Amino acid sequence: MQVGKILLPLLILGNAFMALSANDGRDAKFIPASDSRIAYMGRISTAKPDTVRFTYPGVNINAGFTGTSLKMGVKPGSGSYMIEIDDELPYRLNIGPNDSIVTLAESLPEGNHKVRATYVLEGYALKPEFHGFYVDKGADLSAKPVLPKRKIEFIGNSITCGYGVEADKPTDRFTYD
């Protein structure tokens, strides 16, 4: 009888742990940030192997992919992105202190899809990194997206990138939250 009182909670905890860890990218195919089918726009650094680093808002990561879901490997606690899947309305994705693999899309119909992840914070203190994408087993990235030939570069400071645009009042101080 005592064994049952101990085993049941252990089984419940074990199942809970397995459910939590099931979404960590282990059942997916990893494609590193250095893959030539990923297109970047903005100032990036590729000095660290298989990693793309950046600090400026507006840097975006573009790719086409097949399958029904997509995850992204990032540096934990590195800020926020606006995510666009298949030209649908973008949504904001905040990278928490424990997030290293984040879900961008799931339950998509089978077929070809595209993603754009745009960094939306000043990343100087956060030092964001992109490590790569996770696609479904049997899925892959498509050909590298064609970026616009003409671009406009904005050179400025915090005001240029929208410092305080999400503040409730003019006296609010900047935070990464």
Predicted regions and their residues:
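N-terminal secretory targeting modules
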Residues: 20-155, 160-176
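Bacterial Sec-dependent N-terminal signal peptides
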Residues: 1-27
